[in-house]
């Protein structure tokens, strides 16, 4: 019993933190502040919050300040968040206890966490931050998104990085926290910078009768400045390559959530899954290869034609008064918008497949798409004595109401990305 009490005193706060963060990630907070709770967890990370805003070049709201306390704490107390509150760190530590024989391996691996963190900071200045998806709070949040209902291969894929980290922690204990985690690396860099500012005079002393004597403070400074140099040099190269790639369209286009665009999603999306969890109609899914490598696991919208077991009697589309997905993005990949702004912001355009349409192909009366369209974007034109649907491109917003309601099997009207509509 005494051993249990000692473990509880030592790790009680960490257990509470894991439970609280898991409840936030699962969206089990009270309804009145569920959206705010969903966005809070990833926004506690300055890598996602502050440097995401830097890359976006815009103010994303007062929630940006949620990332400041961790930097302040790191400046004065170092990596205290890692050892006391980080849910990924605690779970990785527990996984590492399964393999006490693997602890020696971690000493042979160079520490890359500071380099990863500085990559993110420097490349954010280029507007194309790298390794955002390695943020531990993002990984933790994404894992719990996988448990939304219904569970599918697509929804589960967003949590794969969590499994990878846990397996790595079990095989090589301490590898993730000590060598790879960029949030830990950022705290380490801030701590070393603070030591550099507080360095005592004469910390670096030259012995007249021999070589220079380096104290621990000067060694820490040398390590810090060396990592900064490596990160800046590599980031300039990779960031420049990212800027060049931003103007290159690769792979097919896909439907994106409101306020999104291809370049912004590819540059800023951390794959945290918040937008997928926030969508009340379960229309947002991780990209499993539709848009190429750079869009992998970023959010795409799927309507009836891409969702199996769709119930055509279910009122399920991108509702004109819903902007929840844009309110929970921690990096600014999805700009926060109002309902009024959404009305002027099409995400795609419907296209009638005339060879499958009951009216066009068979001359049968059917005006379901016209009846269900909330934007009145479907016009009926008389052809051979039958009213046939035609899309008004100036009114269509690509909400998917027509696609979901179409009685055809296969569906005779689908929403396409704007860039692919002829």
Residue ranges and their predicted role:
Residues 1-422:
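Non-ligating segments of multi-cofactor redox enzymes
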């Amino acid at each position: 019993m005494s051993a249990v009490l000692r473990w509880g005193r030592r790790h009680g706060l960490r257990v509470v933190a894991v439970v609280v963060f898991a409840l936030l990630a699962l969206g089990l907070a009270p309804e009145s502040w569920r959206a705010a709770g969903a966005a809070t967890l990833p926004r506690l990370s300055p890598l996602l919050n502050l440097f995401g805003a830097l890359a976006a070049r815009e103010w994303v709201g007062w929630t940006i300040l949620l990332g400041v306390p961790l930097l302040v704490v790191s400046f004065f107390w170092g990596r205290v968040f890692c050892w006391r509150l980080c849910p990924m760190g605690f779970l990785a530590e527990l996984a590492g206890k399964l393999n006490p024989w693997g602890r020696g391996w971690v000493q042979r691996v160079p520490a890359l966490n500071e380099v990863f963190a500085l990559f993110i900071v420097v490349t954010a200045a280029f507007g194309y931050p790298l390794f955002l998806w390695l943020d531990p709070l993002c990984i933790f949040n994404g894992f719990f998104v996988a448990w939304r209902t219904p569970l599918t291969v697509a929804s589960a894929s967003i949590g794969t990085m969590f499994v990878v980290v846990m397996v790595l922690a079990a095989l090589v204990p301490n590898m993730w926290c000590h060598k790879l985690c960029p949030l830990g690396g950022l705290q380490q860099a801030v701590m070393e910078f603070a030591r550099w500012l507080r360095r005592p005079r004469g910390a670096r002393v030259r012995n007249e009768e021999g070589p220079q004597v380096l104290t621990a403070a000067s060694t820490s400074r040398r390590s810090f400045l060396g990592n900064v140099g490596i990160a800046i040099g590599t980031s300039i190269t990779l960031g420049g390559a990212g800027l060049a790639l931003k103007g290159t369209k690769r792979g097919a286009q896909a439907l994106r959530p409101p306020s999104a665009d291809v370049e912004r999603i590819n540059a800023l999306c951390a794959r945290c899954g918040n937008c997928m969890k926030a969508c009340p109609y379960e229309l947002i899914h991780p990209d499993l290869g539709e848009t190429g490598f750079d869009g992998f696991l970023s959010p795409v919208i799927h309507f009836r034609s891409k969702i199996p077991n769709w119930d055509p009697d279910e009122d399920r589309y991108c509702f004109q008064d819903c902007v929840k997905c844009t309110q929970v993005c921690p990096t600014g990949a999805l700009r926060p918008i109002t309902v009024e702004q959404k009305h002027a912001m099409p995400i795609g355009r419907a296209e009638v497949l005339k060879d499958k349409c009951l009216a066009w192909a068979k001359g049968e009366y059917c005006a379901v798409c016209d009846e269900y369209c909330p934007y009145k974007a479907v016009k009926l034109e008389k052809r051979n004595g039958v009213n046939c649907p035609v899309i008004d491109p100036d009114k269509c917003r690509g909400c998917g109401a027509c696609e979901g309601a179409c009685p055809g099997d296969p569906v005779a009207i689908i929403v396409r990305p704007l860039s692919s509509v002829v």
